Amino acid sequence: LDKEPSTPDRTLISGASGMLLSGQVTVLTGASGSGKSVLLRVLAGLLPMSSGTVRLHDDTSSNVYHDMHETAPIRWRQQVALLAQHPQLLDGSVLENLQMPYQLYAHQSQTFDIDWHVAQLEHLDRSADFLQQDAKHLSGGERQLVNTLRLLQLSPKVLLLDEPTAALDIDTSTQLVNLLISWLRADAQRTLLWVTHDTKDIMPLANRHWHMQAGVLTADS
């Protein structure tokens, strides 16, 4: 795929080609401004491509792929989700923030599972009382944990991670990595594309390594 900026002086992504495999972690590295975040936003359907295509395999048939251009945006975003580096939470409790996606048309057919959240919080060394905390009083790490749980509960097939552990303390970073890897391993159809500058925690868990430089993607399988 290719992505041109609104001004013609620079190409943001040039001829990027790759395949994300189910059940795997793909780590994407590169210097700031190399195009990593732009690539994630294109894959998530949040930025248009100048040319090229993105296809998603239909797990009900080995020979069927869904093209992004031919798929309704709501349908695409049900299956491909982006976890941003800087979480945005609404005013209200943690519980209200977790319930918010189910008010959207794309997820009205899904059911909020509070027991799942209580179980996840237990793994994160937090009690169920955490659900009643005011979101505006959370630390940066706690906000990222809430933002992550809010996405994971929706069970996308492809999860795009834009430096999710940046600026987190060591303990919270470890908890977040463990949470994401556990979620991945719970369903063989899931895959992670993980953008990071700090590879020491995630690289040992990675199946593949992609690198981006000046908008050019290279893959090391």
Regions found by a protein language model. Name each.
Residues 134-142:
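Conserved ABC ATPase signature
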Residues 86, 92-108:
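Q-loop/switch helix immediately C-terminal to the Walker
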Residues 53-75:
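ABC ATPase NBD Q-loop/coupling interface
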Residues 44:
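Helix-to-loop junction immediately C-terminal to a conserved catalytic motif
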Residues 159-163:
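Catalytic Walker B motif of ABC-type/P-loop ATPase nucleotide-binding domains
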Residues 111-130:
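Conserved ABC ATPase "signature" region
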Residues 29-31:
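The feature captures the beta-strand-to-loop junction immediately N-terminal to the Walker
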